[in-house]
Each structure stands twice: as C-alpha cells, then as structure tokens.
C-alpha cells in the first residue's frame, strides 16, 4: 500500500476512535485513589463517579485540603470563552467545567461525562467531556448563558503524579484542553487548575522567587503574577501552586488567583492561562503544566524554592 494511503487510513482510524470515545455510552468507573508517602504521612488523592473523575479529596497528615461540596468546589479544571462577542467578558456564560454543572448541585451525578480513567500507585490519568457550568436559560449575576446545551464538546485531560524528582510533597499536574472545531471565539481563558479549600486555610501568601521567602497578601479577590499559598493560621497545613509556564503572553500581571467566599465558607486559589486572537481561537489542544505543593507552610515554601531553581 502506498505511504499516502497508509497515512489516510491512519487518519480516518484516529477520527473514528476519537468519535467512538466521545460518544461512548458506558463511562469508565470514576472512583479511584492514588497515594504516596510524604514526610511522616502520605498524600492521598481520590476521584469519584459523582464528579466525572474530578478530584474530590486530597488528604495529608489527617487533614482534608479540598472542600468538595457541589460540582464546582474541587481540585479541577475549567475553561471560558467569549463566543466572539464584544463588550464585557463574563467567564461563567460559556464555561465548560470538569466536575459538572451548577444544576448538579450537591447531587450524586455529574452532567460532565468521564471518557477514560487510569490510576495506579501514585499516578492518575483521566479524560472528561466537560459540561457547561450554566444550563441553557440560566444566568450568572444577571448575565445569560451563551451555550445552547448542557454537555459541551470540550475535553479536559489530566495527568497527575504525586512526587517530583526527590520531592515527595510536590504533585506534578498536567492538563490538556481540547477545543472542538466549529466554534467561534477570539478569547479563551483556561483555568488550568483551581483548588477550593476549607475556610480554615485562611491565610494567603505569595512566594517571592527572587528571595525564596513568603509575603502575606490580602484576599483580593483576583489574580496577580506571583505563586500563591493558602495556609492554616498555625502554618501546619498549606497548599501552593507554581507553573514554569506562567505568565501568558500579554497577561504578565496575572496568572495566580486567590479568593475568599465568606458566605460559602470556602477559599480558593487558581492558576489561569489566557489566549487572545482576533483571527479566532484555533481548535485543538492547549496543554499546561503545573506543580502543587502540600505540607506545612515551610514544606510548601521549600518546595517552591526547589521548583524555581529547577525551572
């Protein structure tokens, strides 16, 4: 068979396989656990069917780090797009979300669809077809949803590994967003990773790469350019995020966010990337690499020092 015919056959085989995966009727089991020793304890990460394979729990040294209440408060990923509309951008109006939709509430099922999951030892890989956060006809702060269906054609894949080089308390976290063809956008906002944490993680810090020290920061809300750490007051428990790929071109003063929601009794950090293209956001894959450090506040500081030296 001529080479060009082989390439054509392989291309159509891949398209067929992707389509079969996207529209598979029976999802894989989303209940999984990975773990690895870290210090005198171990980091344990748990996913659930309820959240279409998103991370429901992360524990270390007897402490839960994730506030998994509805289908938005997890360790998870989401994306937002402008639908090429002028004027104000409001993220939740077109907002594919890994763990499910707002309407899923605290219920037992997700509108998102888990397509694949592999978990072994300290390593987890998943692919999920994301639901829109808003259902058609719903609104966010008076701004109506732009999507016309609840289940999007956007995919999120993650590859999570507990431990990085000689650092047991660093979690390497890779995400790949797949933007489908046929959509028209000029602005994309990828919340590559966010962590919703219990309210007791109530002190916020930035990591200063030049000195390796931490500096207190107010609760914003919003983003700035330095890695963030959320900690308990006594410093015994903390979580921080760092990405060597920050900042996004043209958005040098953003990337790491921190938020406090007193009424909901939850706090949040995120790591956000942005793409703006007046000619249109191309369909395809958008990969990002991040590192999440867990432990005492000092453990997390030392982990970020090591990461900055590495990258």
Description of each model-found segment:
Residues 1-10:
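Bacterial N-terminal signal peptides that target proteins for export
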Residues 9-19:
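Bacterial N-terminal signal peptides
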Residues 25-41, 46-48, 237-311:
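Beta-strand-rich recognition/accessory modules
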Residues 37-141, 146:
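Acidic-aromatic substrate-binding/catalytic surfaces of carbohydrate-active enzymes
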Residues 51, 59, 167-210:
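Acidic (Asp/Glu-rich), glycine- and aromatic
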Residues 130-132, 160-164, 177-181, 292-296:
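Beta-strand elements of well-folded, non-transmembrane domains
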Residues 146-157:
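Amphipathic hydrophobic-ligand
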Residues 192-195, 200-261:
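Active-site/ligand-binding surface loops and adjacent short beta/alpha elements
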């Amino acid at each position: 068979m001529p080479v060009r015919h082989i390439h054509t056959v392989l291309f159509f085989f891949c398209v067929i396989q992707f389509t079969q995966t996207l529209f598979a009727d029976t999802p894989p089991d989303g209940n999984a656990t990975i773990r690895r020793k870290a210090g005198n304890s171990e980091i344990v990460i748990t996913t659930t069917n309820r959240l279409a394979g998103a991370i429901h729990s992360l524990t270390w040294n007897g402490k839960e780090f994730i506030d998994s209440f509805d289908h938005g408060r997890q360790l998870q990923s989401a994306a937002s797009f402008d639908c090429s509309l002028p004027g104000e951008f409001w993220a939740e109006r077109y907002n594919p979300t890994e763990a499910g939709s707002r309407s899923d509430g605290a219920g037992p099922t997700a509108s998102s669809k888990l397509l694949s999951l592999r978990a072994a030892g300290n390593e987890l890989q998943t692919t999920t077809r994301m639901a829109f956060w808003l259902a058609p006809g719903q609104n966010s702060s008076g701004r109506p949803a732009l999507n016309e269906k609840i289940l999007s054609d956007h995919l999120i894949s993650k590859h999570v590994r507990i431990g990085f080089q000689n650092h047991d308390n660093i979690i390497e976290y890779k995400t790949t967003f797949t933007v489908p063809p046929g959509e028209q956008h000029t602005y994309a906002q990828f919340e590559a990773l966010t962590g919703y944490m219990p309210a007791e993680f109530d002190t916020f810090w930035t990591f200063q790469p030049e000195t390796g020290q931490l500096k207190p920061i107010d609760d914003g809300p919003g983003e700035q350019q330095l890695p963030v750490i959320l900690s308990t007051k006594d410093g015994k428990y903390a979580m921080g995020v760092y990405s060597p790929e920050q900042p996004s071109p043209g958005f040098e003063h953003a990337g790491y966010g921190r938020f406090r929601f007193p009424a909901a009794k939850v706090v949040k950090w995120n790591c956000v990337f942005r793409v703006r293209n007046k000619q249109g956001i191309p369909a395809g894959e958008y990969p990002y690499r991040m590192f999440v450090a867990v432990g005492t506040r000092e453990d997390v500081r030392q982990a970020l020092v090591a990461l900055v030296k590495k990258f």
